[in-house]
Amino acid sequence: MCLSALILVSLAAFTAGAGHPSSPPMVDTVQGKVLGKYISLEGFTQPVAVFLGVPFAKPPLGSLRFAPPQPAEPWSSVKNATSYPPMCFQDPVTGQIVNDLLTNRKEKIPLQFSEDCLYLNIYTPADLTKSDRLPVMVWIHGGGLVLGGASTYDGLVLSTHENVVVVVIQYRLGIWGFFSTGDEHSRGNWGHLDQVAALHWVQDNIAKFGGDPGSVTIFGESAGGESVSVLVLSPLAKNLFQRAISESGVALTAGLVKKNTRPLAEKIAVISGCKNTTSAAMVHCLRQKTEEELLGTTLKLNLFKLDLHGDSRQSHPFVPTVLDGVLLPKMPEEILAEKNFNTVPYIVGINKQEFGWILPTMMNYPPSDVKLDQMTAMSLLKKSSFLLNLPEDAIAVAIEKYLRDKDYTGRNKDQLLELIGDVVFGVPSVIVSRGHRDAGAPTYMYEFQYSPSFSSEMKPDTVVGDHGDEIYSVFGAPILRGGTSEEEINLSKMMMKFWANFARNGNPNGQGLPHWPEYDQKEGYLQIGATTQQAQKLKEKEVAFWTELLAKKQLPTEHTEL
């Protein structure tokens, strides 16, 4: 192993060198040879072969902007796959902040961004000289379909501890990934098509890395969980995976799936200085823009932000998944009702306080010490219509139910955030789980209830199970970073074991683990935290309340969420 590669990995949690083969790992993919590096986790003799920045599609530049991904071009020399690829274009400041908040690494890596970003990272503990066939776990990152990247998530611990091949993929984001004119000129969902292309690449190549293409689990968090859910529903992803895990995000998650995004396309065109007369004119003009110009448009869209002063109906904080007739032939709720989807074993979970701190902070909600009476709450929820998709008269009924204190008593802010968390995450996750169960597929649910020690110091101690908190456990942050309690290390080991057992055989249960009941008509689920135990009927009352309320007060326009 070369000295520079050693320096890269000689961090506190690693030891590089002992027990490594004499030469770095090399794999011959369909497109050409890739050279990786060996890394060992402290205390483990078996090294993991790591390949970073492996291309799975042609760079989506020029005429391939707003077009389906094309297979990567072959190469004749050996491609060096030992450094992190650039992340897909996004707001660089927010992208770096989110990376630093969510990463399981100890070290911080300065991020690079590019439109040329269709790469994946592979972590394999397999002996590449033998024909191992290990389970494959493909991670799809979150970030509201506008932020995030592969290299935030180091697969070393999960791969080492559970003897699985971990693949972390990237996909086009924001305007680049989801711009849709609603017709043949730019159907949209380019980012999801990138995810499908990455899964095809895994089918064609992962056996060379010691992975079993017949045992692929897709898992993701937030918009990554929504992406997993979309792929479960999509005919394009049939037979590309055998199991699925959605953490804090499903295809019914508010704001992330729309029937029609034409108004947003026209707004993007106008901000970019393009005429929005016809679809062809918009697409042609936007393809001429530099990536920096489109980044300027992205920043002007104020993605992920609550606009407290403008017209909320004109607000577009997401560039969402769209009903395109190809990836999504119908709206998610219709596909679920028809039971015509990929009925693979499925874990769906939420965190106890999904709208506890990180999301309201990023979206510019007032800080927790702001006094909140019912009138202020009503105003905030009206401004949140982009996220909640609630008719105005439903908001008043919901406030009556959730905000039980007429005047400010200190609890109203928490109750408002609970309301938003239920609408955006809790209720949709239960409805998707029920639909999956009713289609006859093995389904498991969890609620994560733990406050990791790696959280930002700015997060209030009262927030337990914030959005994204489970990622630290799933990717072994307590082991990789060190300096944490035995309880937190054991929680991480347990969650990795649950996830990997599920990847191995479609059932998370195993020796030495608390029993996780299947989500059947009794609706048993697992509460995961300092104490992990079975419970029943997650969010049952909330689902009943919102289902009944929205049935009575159906929106006259599109109804995309609950």
From Swiss-Prot:
Q: Main localisation, per the record?
A: endoplasmic reticulum
Positions occupied by motif Prevents secretion from ER? 559-562
InterPro entries on file? AB_hydrolase_fold, CarbesteraseB, Carboxylesterase_B_AS, Carboxylesterase_B_CS, Type-B_Carboxylest/Lipase
GO terms (molecular function) for this protein are: all-trans-retinyl-palmitate hydrolase, all-trans-retinol forming activity; carboxylesterase activity
Cysteine disulfide partners in this protein: 88-117, 274-285
What catalytic reaction does the record list? a carboxylic ester + H2O = an alcohol + a carboxylate + H(+); all-trans-retinyl hexadecanoate + H2O = all-trans-retinol + hexadecanoate + H(+)
Pfam families recorded: COesterase
Keyword terms, alphabetized: Disulfide bond, Endoplasmic reticulum, Glycoprotein, Hydrolase, Membrane, Microsome, Serine esterase, Signal
Please list the residues that make up the active site. Answer: 222 (acyl-ester intermediate), 354 (charge relay system), 467 (charge relay system)
A cellular component term, taken from the record's GO annotations:
endoplasmic reticulum lumen
Secretion signal span = 1-19
Which PROSITE patterns does the protein's record reference? CARBOXYLESTERASE_B_1, CARBOXYLESTERASE_B_2
Q: Where in the cell is it found?
A: Endoplasmic reticulum lumen; Microsome membrane
Keyword tRNA processing in record: no
Which top EC class is named for this enzyme in its record? hydrolase
Positions bearing carbohydrate = 80, 276, 490
Protein EC: 3.1.1.1
Task: State the protein's purpose.
Answer: Involved in the detoxification of xenobiotics and in the activation of ester and amide prodrugs. Hydrolyzes retinyl esters.
Q: Which family does it belong to?
A: Belongs to the type-B carboxylesterase/lipase family.
This chain's protein is named Carboxylesterase 1E
Organism of derivation: Mus musculus
